[in-house]
Amino acid sequence: MKKKILIVSGGISKERIISIDTGKQVAKELRKNGYLVKICEPDKNFLSITKNFKPHIIFNALHGQFGEDGYIQSILEIIGIPYTHSGVISSAKAMDKEISKRIFKKNKILTPKYFLYTFNKTDKKLISEINKKLGFPVVIKPINEGSSVNVFICTRRNIFSKLKLLKDYKKVLIEQFIPGREIQAAIIGKKKLGAIELKPKRKFYDYQAKYNSKAKTEHIIPVDLKKNDYNKLMDIALKAHRLIECRGVTRSDFKFYNGKFYLLEINTQPGMTSLSLVPEIAAY
């Protein structure tokens, strides 16, 4: 009897299109390998589809809010069907950038300096705090989005216009900007899968650089690092994976500057599209 796998993809987050693409790519590969596959949305029909299809496992192909923040994982725990990727608590910890950065700092993993901003300071006080704690330029980002959605590099001149775009989030992370090389490392289970370097033509590896085929981001694999540096990179990625208590696959995003690796964040639901990095690392 063929094993049945239900892929849940789409959803209502800003990464819906990426999730749909991930679901299609995963379904294609699973069918090639002899599995009986069905794709569904996490909507009002989800529970009845699950009940009728009776999958052996659910492949979580959702990205962003409600897909990698512990929400869908909670539902899957309640209905008692095994599912892929990280569980409820680990997903929530990884998705909340402020919580995950606190865990990194506590465990001596280097991460850019930051503070949480809740839109309750005057312009003058905010500028003063940034100058004192971080210095310009800075990176501003929602604490609970993925795929670099609404992430901006800001100078003193444009920070307030960019913050206005994020006001609906209520709180955002203001983070020290680290120049240098963009390197991402993948872990699967307890295995160090590998790493890839990115050279975007844009200012940084944002949403467009990730998913627009015309953005022409250069992917470099193998990464040009000394053996000791490469081993250090993969050790940090595995340490972060374990600290957040992840399972399955994760991708950790780093900046490499002045001989040091700065961990930006860990992703528990890395994309599996034709432009995604983990499949490229795995295929190498």
Can you annotate each of these PLM segments?
Residues 176, 185, 241-274, 282:
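Conserved metal-phosphate-binding beta-hairpin within the catalytic cores
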Residues 1-89, 93-95, 99, 118-126:
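ATP-binding N-terminal substructure of ATP-dependent carboxylate-amine bond-forming enzymes
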Residues 1-9, 37, 52, 93-181:
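Active-site nucleotide/adenylate-binding loops and adjacent lid/helix of ATP-dependent enzymes
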Residues 155-232, 255-262:
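Phosphate-binding site of ATP-dependent enzymes
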Residues 31, 77, 105, 132-134, ...:
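Anion (oxyanion) recognition and catalysis
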Residues 203-207, 272-281:
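A short, polar/charged loop-to-alpha-helix boundary motif
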Residues 22, 233-236:
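Hydrophobic alpha-helical membrane-association signature
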